[in-house]
Structure formats: C-alpha cells, structure tokens
Amino acid sequence: MIATQKHFHRIIVNGKEIGYIQILSYNNSHPQIEYNLDEKYHNTGIMTRELVQYLDTIKNDYKAITAVVKEDNLASIRILIKNGFIQIPFGKAGYKIYLKNL
C-alpha cells in the first residue's frame, strides 16, 4: 500500500521545527492522521493545541479521519480524546484505532 501525504503541518517553536502533523491517504480512502513531537516537548500541551488548529484547517476536506496508536501510548490517546476522537472496535493486536467525524 502506498500512502499519499496531504496537509503537512510543521510545528515550530522559537524558530525550530519540533514536530509535524499530516494526513496520509491510502488508495485515496481512509484518511489517517499522523503526528510526531520532539520528546523534549511532550506533556506541554503543544500537540493538543496544534491538533485543534490543524483539524479546523482540514475540516472541509474530509468527512472523517482515523488515527492508529499503540495501545500503551497513553499520551497520544489523551491527545486524540481531547480532540474529539472516539475509539472504534477495529485494529490489530497492540494497536487502537480512533475516529473523528469532521
């Protein structure tokens, strides 16, 4: 499966790129959000705030998006829940899938 990258957003703090958010589409369906943040900035609220703004920017381009997260990545799960994602009953062992209707 080849992913198409869309809506790439760099997270910049004090002139330094510390993370990103993007949408990946597989075969033009099932858009999936992916994000990453430098560990030094974890638990600061930056990703939660950036994701709020990002979702507002893309809301007219998608009906819904998904996120796949390791089930032990509690910080990422909290970010998704704070941004209105709900867990759906699909996924492979060790991972959870979250969905957000836009």
Where are these predicted regions, by residue range?
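Conserved GNAT-fold acetyl-CoA-binding loop/helix
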Residues: 1
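Acyl-donor (CoA/ACP) binding surface of acyl/acetyltransferases
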Residues: 4-102
